[in-house]
Amino acid sequence: MYIKSFSAKSNDFKKMWYCIDATGKILGRLATNIASRLRGKHKVEYTPHVDIGDYLIVINAKNIKVTGKKCTDKFYYHHTGYVGGLKKIAFKDMLHRYPERIIEIAVRGMLPKGPLGRSMFKKLKVYANDNHNHSAQNPKILNI
């Protein structure tokens, strides 16, 4: 007699849609909760090699908070690919120009690297204000 262990498959689970309001939330604490839900760690059937996480809509990204002096001292770096092409932008400037990217960068760093992490990241939708175009999915409000 063989006792088979349970192996989750991505298609066996219904993925829910949730909406999170980022107003007044701390960036790191919010990002860890988002990454955990994208991976599916809140579910009993969690399996590390299967994408069973839910879809998340984050609204009001422009109202995110950070602690300490990170608003002025935190920088985001990227390289253009040319010699001397290292660019940096301060957190406060990034918050005014691209508020969605702040949450996306924080969450992407907490997800697995590789194809599985990329598929998990595609389930995250971030918006600077409270308007989103996913009302057809009937997202549930998630308080974090």
From Swiss-Prot:
Family recorded in the similarity comment: Belongs to the universal ribosomal protein uL13 family.
Alphabetized GO MF terms: mRNA binding; structural constituent of ribosome
PROSITE patterns membership: RIBOSOMAL_L13 (PS00783)
Pfam families for this protein: Ribosomal_L13
InterPro entries: Ribosomal_uL13, Ribosomal_uL13_bac-type, Ribosomal_uL13_CS, Ribosomal_uL13_sf
Biological processes, Gene Ontology terms: negative regulation of translation; translation
Name of the featured protein: Large ribosomal subunit protein uL13
UniProt entry tagged with the keyword NADP: no
Purpose of the protein: This protein is one of the early assembly proteins of the 50S ribosomal subunit, although it is not seen to bind rRNA by itself. It is important during the early stages of 50S assembly.
The keyword Mitochondrion appears for this protein: no
One term under GO cellular component: cytosolic large ribosomal subunit
Species, as recorded: Buchnera aphidicola subsp. Baizongia pistaciae (strain Bp)
NCBIfam families to which the protein is assigned, alphabetical: rplM_bact
Disulphide-bonded residues: none
Lineage, uppermost ranks: Bacteria, Pseudomonadati, Pseudomonadota, Gammaproteobacteria, Enterobacterales
Subunit structure: Part of the 50S ribosomal subunit.
HAMAP family: Ribosomal_uL13
Keywords: Ribonucleoprotein, Ribosomal protein
